[in-house]
Amino acid sequence: RAVKLLGGLKFLVVQDLFYTKTAEMADVILPGSAGWCETEGTVTSSERRVQRVRAAVPLPDGVLDDMEIVFRLARQFGHEWGKPDAETIWNELRQLSPMHAGMSYKRLEELGGIQWPCYDEAHPGEMYLHSRLWQEPLIGPRAPFHAVEFESPVDELNEQFPIRLTTGRYLDSYNTGAQSERFPSPLRRAATIDLSPEDGERYQVGEGEKVRVSSRRGSVVAPVRFDSGLRPGLAFLSVHFHEQVATNDLTIDAVDPKSGTSEFKATAIRIEKYLDN
């Protein structure tokens, strides 16, 4: 669906560090900077810790800093923002985001990083979220808990599509491989449809044998790999190798009504022997 929508655009501009599949469709490519070594700014880790990032190497010829690209685009649209400055932009973010308000560059450098939320420059940041809930006596309301009712996936199983497919990543690869496929890995392996050994017997297919995997939206061909960690009736495909196996040709574009999360993890499929002509 994304390929169809992007292909229908009259003009597509992509800014990226790598020549991705999306960049291949672009009319204009703006080569961006490598945030981890070529640009000034901040980085936020998965523990909510904000730290300073400094440019370690100069930009290659023909490459602009991401800030410079945005500022030049603004200028083309009639907005003069002056000269790009990472600290000025960060301070603008602090004004708009209360949980970052206390994180000046000076404090980030002195403390080696601060965990959000940090509401003012006297605030130390919070090691864990919702800390007030653990205070004695409790300040403010208690956390609401309530039971939720189970709702089946939109893509229902039946006799025609009896297997539940879930998608995901391999340990050594990341998404479509724009970053991770550029280096070799002893763990890397080709795309496979992973099945339980019991399902291999049920459908009379062997390890390495090609099968056709079909859903209500499309089909792909992939070799079988047995995984004893999968229960019968559950299959797995990675999302990394679109040229080998176009996994998302199978998945559904339904979304969770509350979170908006795509239901990529629950596709109804069937597998059939494949005769390679």
Which residues make up each language-model segment?
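Short, solvent-exposed amphipathic alpha-helical segments in soluble enzyme
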Residues: 1-6, 28-29, 156, 180-184, ...
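Long, contiguous, secondary-structure-rich segments that constitute the structural scaffold
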Residues: 56-120, 176, 181-194, 198-277
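Short, well-ordered loop/turn and helix-capping segments at boundaries between secondary-structure elements
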Residues: 8-11, 28-35, 59, 75-80, ...
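Short strand-coil-strand connectors
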Residues: 51, 159, 214-218
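Flexible glycine/proline-rich, aromatic-decorated loop/lid segments
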Residues: 18-54
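Beta-sheet entry/capping signal
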Residues: 10-12, 28-29, 162-164, 192, ...
